[in-house]
């Protein structure tokens, strides 16, 4: 792998190696630019995926050196429901390894639907929210969705329905098997007149681009994939970036600041180098791409204060860190007479799409969501979560645990969350992280509309499980998110610098050679997992950035 000296001014520094950072690294390095990817995590099993460990203890309680996710002891954070509360220590985590969250995520990879880019125009706004149209349309992004799906490797159904975004090209791989959960949900759908399809996933169902197809081992969500079937940045993108000879991945590099000169241009990044006793190092760069995720990205911008940017970098609008969206839950669990064997295969096999569209009049709330059925939990997860309707310990607990462990199915739903300005990521004035910097503080309470949506999906989950033949059903309580893996909206894109942080090509309004490329740029949250849209937007940004750099619009 190419190695650059910190004193050597590279064309691009990319902060983060996940869904967006991996795309940016591959595209920019392939175009001939010099690239350094700053990753605060370790290598993981990069290049040696067969060494990923399936041990539940290691994956649930990872050792510092082997971790795949961030550790709240080091990447400390706090949480509160509103600005009047005192924040307490939080448990927010994210992917912290080469490949970021794509190494361990469940890999659902649906596109946004066309109307999700112009909801304000199509459906109107709502009091107390920041609902607005995106500065880009689905038609502009569609070619990049296709590019992402084919280069990364996506499995999914090739069917046409208004409930799925129109595609110029089918998915490259056939769908993953439906499993017992899929068969049961199809049974319910036939009774309830619902549309069910196989899930769209960044897990290849068959050999693709030199990688093995999924072997249905069951050590899926939360684990690294030993056969490279999960299309993470670590296997589908970064090896190609490194192979160009233009890209260095620099691990254990904790970026603390994006530096700027007197004219307001980014000049590089200052980071703590674990390999050098955590000494501060400055890496020079002509352009900085920030792809750290929807919570660490705004935190780093706020940490990068200077006399020119006293409110934080790229924050003349005052919106950095605001409009945080994470995705709410709310579902139900059902017990079935026969064993389900859901421990096999990918975590999600089937999806209910009927409630994706917006239908305020019929449902009483703004937004929608996609419903999935899952039974995959490891023995340790079952033991810690506990059986439903049973004592919390003793013989009754053990009996219920044995009875339910392989016969329980849970509806897990991804529901739209409206952008609210007071839902924020900022700097905690009291807590410091392991490097002595202000810790991340998350403040979030869902809009009252979202609580209505959560209750709607809880009720629908109960209906579906009963129709599927569940002998017992337990409804979840409303789960108002405390932050999570799908953070977005905290550096929103737009045409007006007064009401957005970056433009339609992810260039910061205030800093001409700073690009924010991850879920932070989302304007509205969407009804599906955000990763495929993050990837498509990154391909679009890279395309623009390469053309701009070669034409002199970005000085490289």
Residues of each region from the PLM?
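Beta1/beta-strand and adjacent pyrophosphate-binding region of the FAD-binding site
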Residues: 4-20
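Conserved N-terminal glycine-rich FAD pyrophosphate-binding loop of Rossmann-like flavoproteins
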Residues: 42-66, 95-108
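Conserved redox-cofactor binding core of oxidoreductases
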Residues: 61-71, 76, 81, 85-88, ...
